[in-house]
């Protein structure tokens, strides 16, 4: 396995990622984001993550759900596709409990993670999908709050409290990037 390296992502790096659509672009050339977000406990996460992703200029949002969450998402953003299909990036875990069997909807959401693990496109992991961090082949960005990061690190035999992470987030971000 190749040694993992980390570097600082700058505003200049971000600017190079922004592509202004031209008259020859279409939804597929502008990117298709697969979303596995929201749950019965946190349905708003599905709606907010989908509408926020569409506001970026993304070509298509593909919401993966086997529950009533799709109706909420479609009510807010009818342009969302709610059928499985190819994606160019993933966002997973927001609004999903980290315990797979906490409720039936969460169990179903975790089953969708199997699809994510079979692909190699860039992936953003949050909340309930953080257990996949460091286990995927694809480029991965994690977005935990301090409590989620403490739980993730503890699952990797690193003892740290959320208060310690909040007191020195830069150090813990660096340590996490080296660990994962």
Language-model regions, residue ranges each:
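Small-residue (G/A/S/T)-rich helix-start motifs and N-terminal tracts that mark the onset
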Residues: 1-127, 131-141, 146, 150-180
């Amino acid at each position: 396995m190749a040694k993992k390296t980390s570097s600082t992502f700058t505003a200049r790096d971000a600017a190079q990622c922004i592509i202004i659509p031209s008259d020859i672009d279409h939804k597929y050339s502008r990117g298709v984001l697969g979303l596995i977000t929201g749950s019965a406990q946190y349905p708003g996460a599905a709606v907010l993550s989908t509408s926020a992703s569409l506001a970026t200029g993304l070509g298509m949002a593909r919401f993966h759900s086997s529950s009533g969450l799709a109706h909420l998402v479609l009510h807010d953003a009818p342009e969302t596709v709610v059928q499985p299909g190819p994606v160019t990036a993933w966002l997973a875990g927001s609004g999903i409990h980290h315990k797979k069997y906490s409720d039936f909807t969460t169990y179903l959401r975790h089953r969708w993670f199997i699809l994510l693990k079979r692909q190699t496109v860039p992936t953003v992991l949050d909340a309930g999908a953080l257990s996949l961090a460091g286990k995927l082949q694809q480029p991965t960005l994690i977005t935990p709050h301090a409590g989620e990061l403490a739980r993730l690190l503890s699952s990797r035999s690193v003892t740290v409290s959320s208060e310690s992470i909040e007191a020195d987030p830069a150090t813990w971000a660096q340590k996490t990037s080296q660990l994962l």
